[in-house]
Amino acid sequence: MLLDALSMTEKLRPRVCLVLTAGGDPSDYYAVSYEAFNAAGCDVTELKLFPQPSAGPEERLGSCDLVWVGGGSVANLLALWRLHGVDAAMRHAWESGVILAGVSAGSVCWYVGGTTDSFGPTLEPVTNGLGLLPYANGVHYDS
């Protein structure tokens, strides 16, 4: 999936912004992600909300070819993005042609909703996604 997202940019050296909000912006997750994207020939930056938000989310996201969003709690991700205006910045990036992709929470967030374990051990509906795609997304449907 990662290579498919990178190929959609049609760039030899895509500019990628990592957004790992759903997992709490863990430094080890960033390190592994930087390693993977650098190995794939990308220029990498990040947009963090912990412990302090990165400045200029709209400019940071808009200057990239691909935004890659990691997994974790989609409920926390959506709440924090809305609090910090990242939701609007993501929409603007998408409308400007930036490829938006990700895994788990980083996949559900683009849709109207889907299922999540963000509220407890069982899958529950999440219905307040960004709505960039007018569908539901069932990640982890087999787990």
Listing of model-derived features with the role each one plays in the protein:
Residues 78-143:
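Class I SAM-dependent methyltransferase SAM-binding "motif I" and its flanking Rossmann-like core
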Residues 1-66:
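N-terminal beta1-alpha1 cap of cysteine-dependent amidohydrolase-like domains
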Residues 42-99:
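Flexible gly/pro-rich beta->alpha loop and the following alpha-helix that scaffold active-site loops
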Residues 12-17, 72-73, 133:
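Short, surface-exposed connector motifs at secondary-structure boundaries
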Residues 23, 73, 107:
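Short, glycine/serine-rich, charged loops/turns that create anion-binding
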Residues 19-20, 69-70, 138:
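Short beta-strand segments
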